[in-house]
Amino acid sequence: VFLQAVLEKEDVHVCVMDSPRSEFKAYAVEERVDYCTTEEDVFEFFKGLLPEFKRRNVLKNQMLEQEKEEDEILDRMMQETPYFIFISDLSWFVPFIYKATLDMKGFLENVLEKGRLHNIYFISELDMKNKSNLMGYKIYESFVSYKTGIHFGGKTAENTLFSFDYMSYTEQNKPEKVGVGQLPNAMDKDSAKKVVVPRARR
């Protein structure tokens, strides 16, 4: 649903990095999507992203030197064309990058560590059952350090990446309906705590 919503925007760069399970194969024929499945595909995409990331990073650092506030930096970066990079399965992607013959882990580590406020976004799915296999990888640690996302399936107590302290113990151990996601750190009583994805129920 998020991917489809992004494609409705006119000026946007979209990339899909799909695992061998081909969960996003429907987008392989989408002209506006860079659909990557092989090591060579992924390497070429990041090779093309490198100069753009460097340019934006220089701009960000210049604004930091000018003691600009984060809101000002973000406002400026929002004038740049956004990049949305969708990864079908983080538990596949991280080992894939580190085992690749073509070296791209250094660049990706740098992007995820320093890429905040660049208007470049990485979106991925992760089954909590596979989380332990990724611990220790710098790409994974940087990815989850942002503490942003949506937890689907209920039983939020099993998710140690996000904080759901605003929920009671009982609520944190309840399963949830298909398509209903829980937002972390929704401490403000007026903030949204759940999202509903209607299409996921079909």
Per-region residue spans from a language model:
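P-loop NTPase catalytic phosphate-binding loop
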Residues: 1-65, 75-157, 170-171
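Phosphate-binding and hydrolysis-coupling loops of NTP-dependent motor/remodeling domains
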Residues: 137-202
